[in-house]
Amino acid sequence: MRTHYCGNLNKSLAGQTVELCGWVNRRRDLGGLIFIDMRDREGVVQVVVDPDMKDIFPIANQLRNEFCIKFTGEVRVRPDSQVNKDMATGEVELYATGLEIINRSEALPLDFNQTNSEEQRLKYRYIDLRRPEMSDRIKLRARASSFVRRFLDENLFLDIETPVLTKATPEGARDYLVPSRVHKGSFYALPQSPQLFKQLLMMSGFDRYYQIVKCFRDEDLRADRQPEFTQIDIETSFLTSQEVRNVTEKLVHDMWKELLDVELGQFPVMPFSEAIRRFGSDKPDLRNPLELVDVADLVKDVEFKVFSGPANDEKGRVAVIRVPGGAKLTRKQIDGYAEHVNIYGAKGLAWMKVNDRAAGMEGIQSPVAKFLSEDVINGILDRTQAESGDIILFGADKAGIVAEAMGALRLKLGTDLELTDTSAWAPLWVVDFPMFEEDGEGNLHAMHHPFTSPLGVNAEELKANPAAANSDAYDMVINGYEVGGGSVRIHSAEMQTAVFGILGIEAKEQQEKFGFLLEALKYGTPPHAGLAFGLDRLAMLLCGTENIRDVIAFPKTTAAACLLTDAPSLANPASLEELAIAVKLAEKKEQA
C-alpha cells in the first residue's frame, strides 16, 4: 500500500512519486490550500493539497485528526523561507495527487495537546501509543532487544526456550498458579525466572544459553515493577564470575554506545559491605555525592542515649550525612525529612547546622549539641570535613534501619537540593553479597536464591558458620537501579543439600520440590554461572523515564490490573467446574 514512511522523506527523493499511509496528525487551511501533517511510526511530514486537485480536495476537506489515510504525491523541496527546522522532514513536503480515507476516527477519548490521566492512557493504550513520545520509547526498546540478540549470537550464545508451565519453587515472591484440567487439584506455576531450567541446560552441555523471556511474580508493585516482566536470561558453563561480568558489562557498554552514543567506561566494582556502609543501599546511585559516615566510636561515651545506645550495640549503628550548603534548610524542611526517614523505621532525625566553623561552639546550631562535648562535635566535624554553611544529619538505630533510612534520605536530598547529576551515567558492579540474611526471627533466608554458590568455603565450612559466608554473586547497578543480577551456581549435590538444610528445607521437602535438580547434580555437572537483566528496566533507563510502564506496550496498573481488557476477570462457571475449582469470595461488609 505504501512505498515510504512519512518520517523518512528527504531531499534525495525530490521529484519522486511516493505513497504514504498513516494518520492525520493535524490539519490546517491556509490561503486556499489544505495542509495535512501526516504521521506514521517513523515521523511526520507535511502534505499540501491544492484546490486545483479537484478529485481529492473535497476529500481532504473531510479529514480530521486521527483519520487513517493514504496519500499519493510528489516529494518537493521547500523554499528556504518555508523550511521547518523543528521537523526531521522539514526540508520537504508532499504535493498530493491522490488521497484515500482508509478509516475515519471518532472524537478521541485522549487529548494529545494536554496531560491525560494515567488511567485514561492505559484504558486507551492503543491511542496513547500513537503519540510520538510513546512510539519512540517502544521503538528504542525494540532496538535494545535486537542489539541483545545480535550481541549474544555473535558471542556464541544459543537462544533456547524453556517451559512456561512449570513447578512452583520458592524464589522469594508468590507464584501465579495455573490449574490443570487433566490433573485435577494440581497446579502449574508460571516461572518467576527460568533459573532451574537454564542450569539444567548447562548440565545438558549447552554451555552458552540466552533467552529474552517473560517472567511472572505475584508481588506488591511499584513504579519499576510489573507482575509480568521481560528478562534477558543468560547462563554459561566454564566461566568464572569475573568472566561473566566481563561479557555482560561489554553487552551493556556496547548497547549504550550504539543506542545513545554514550561511552560508559569501565564499571567500578564495589563490595556489598562498602555499598551499605557508604550509601546505605546495595544499589547505590553514584551520581549523588552524599555519603554516610560512621561516627559510633565518637559517641559511645556521651550521655545522650539516642546516640550512645546504638553506638554500644553490636547490631546498632550511628551514621551521619554531611549536606554541603544544607544550613539554609528551614525547620519545616528538616521536619519533612524526619517524616521521610520515619517511613523506613527511624524514630527521628537529629541535626547540626554548621553556621560558622571558625566560631567553634558558637557557630553550631543544634538541638542535640547540649548533649555533646566540644571534642565530640569537633570530631564529627573533622571526620565529615564539614564547612561553614553545611548541615549534618544523624541516624542512630539498628544497623539495618540506619542504612535503609539514611540511604533513602540521601536519595531524597540529592533530588531536592539538585545535588544528583541527572545528566550523568553511573554504572557499577556490587559483589560479595552475604550468602544469607536473617528474617528478624533468627531464621536464615537466601539473599539471592538457594542455588547461589558460596564464596571460598566448602559444604562443611558453610554449615559451621553460615551467617558469616559470602556468596559468589554480583549485581549490575546503573544510576541507582539494579538492572541485572547473577551468580556462580552450586554445581555439587553435597553443597546444594547443605544450603537447603541451612534454609530449613528438610530432606523430604528437598526431594519433593527439588528432587529433579539434586538427581541431575549427580551426573557430571559443569561449573556454571549466569546473570539476568531486566529488559524493562534497561529500556526505562535508555528512554530517560522513571516509570517502567512507559516502556511496556500494554502494562498493568499498580493493582496488577489491565484497564484496557479489564483483566483479571471472573472465570466462566463451566470452566471452573471442569477444573474442579470452587471460588469462595470474601463477603463485602455492609456499610452502616
Swiss-Prot record:
Binding of ATP: at which residues?
R217, D218, E219, Q226, E482, G534, L535, D536, R537
Aspartate as annotated region, ranges: 195-198
Keyword Nucleus set for record: no
Among the record's GO biological process terms, what is one? aspartyl-tRNA aminoacylation
Where L-aspartate binds, per the record, is at E171, R217, H448, R489
At the top level, the lineage of the source is Bacteria
Q: Which reaction does it catalyse?
A: tRNA(Asp) + L-aspartate + ATP = L-aspartyl-tRNA(Asp) + AMP + diphosphate
Q: Does the keyword Cell cycle apply?
A: no
Q: Subunit composition?
A: Homodimer.
Protein name, entry field = Aspartate--tRNA ligase
Q: Which organism is it from?
A: Vibrio atlanticus (strain LGP32)
